[in-house]
C-alpha cells in the first residue's frame, strides 16, 4: 500500500472528466445541456470537471464562449466538485490573460498545455509556464504534456525547475508512455501530482505513481473507473485488472479517430444530444459508429 501523502490525498481527486462542449442544432454552445452533463458526471464518478481542453474543443471556442461555459457550469455544481479550465495557448500573453480570468472567475485550477506549433525549446517552455504561474499565484496549475498534438515535449527536468513556483503542483501526462510517470517522479519526487492523460494507461500509470486520470471514458463509465481505482488502492489488484481489461475495447473505440469525435458520438447513442464537433472535425462515419455502438451494447451501457 502506497502511503505518500500526495498519493493518498490527490490535489483534484482521482477522476477528472475532460468534458465535451455540447452544441445545439445551430452549432452554438448549449450551456443548459453543459450544466446537465457536468452535474451528471459529478454524480457518476467524477471528482472534477475539466472544461475547454482538447475534448472540449478549445481550438474552435472563442474566449467569450469559454468564459461563459465556465461560468454556467461552475455556478451549477456543488462546491466539492473541482472545476479546472483549459487556459493554455501558444501565445504566452494570451495564456496569461486567460489564466488570470479563470482565477478571477473562481476556477479551482487551470490546465495549461505545452505551446503548440511554434515548438519552443525547454528554456522557452520554462519562461512560458513561469510567466503564467506568476500571473495567478494563488491558482493551482496543471501542466499538460501531450507531444503528439503539440509537437513539443516538456521534459522532467524542466518540470522540476517549474515546481519552484508554489502553484505548479500537477501535470497531465499524455505522452502515451508509462515511463513518463517514473521519469517525472525521479526528477520531481512524490510532491508532483501526476494524472494519466490516457484512460487505457490509468491502471498501469497508477502502479508506478500516478494519482488519477483526466478522462474521456468517464463520460460513459465513470463509476466503473472509480471502482477500478479503489480496488487498486485497497490492494485488490486482480479486481482492478478485471475492470481494466473489460473496458479496453471502449478505451480503444473512443480513440478510433480524433478525440472528441467518438465520445460525442457515444454520448449521442446514449441519448445526450451534444451535437457534432465543430469544423474542421467531422462526425464518425457509418462504419465507425456501428463499431462504437457494438462496444457500448457489449458493455450494457
Curated annotation (Swiss-Prot):
The record marks 54, 117 as: Part of a proton relay during catalysis. This is 4-hydroxy-tetrahydrodipicolinate synthase. Its EC number is 4.3.3.7. InterPro entries: Aldolase_TIM, DapA, DapA-like, Schiff_base-form_aldolases_AS, Schiff_base-form_aldolases_CS. It comes from Prochlorococcus marinus (strain MIT 9215). Its main location: cytoplasm. GO terms for cellular component: cytosol. It catalyses: L-aspartate 4-semialdehyde + pyruvate = (2S,4S)-4-hydroxy-2,3,4,5-tetrahydrodipicolinate + H2O + H(+). It is an enzyme of class 4 (lyase).
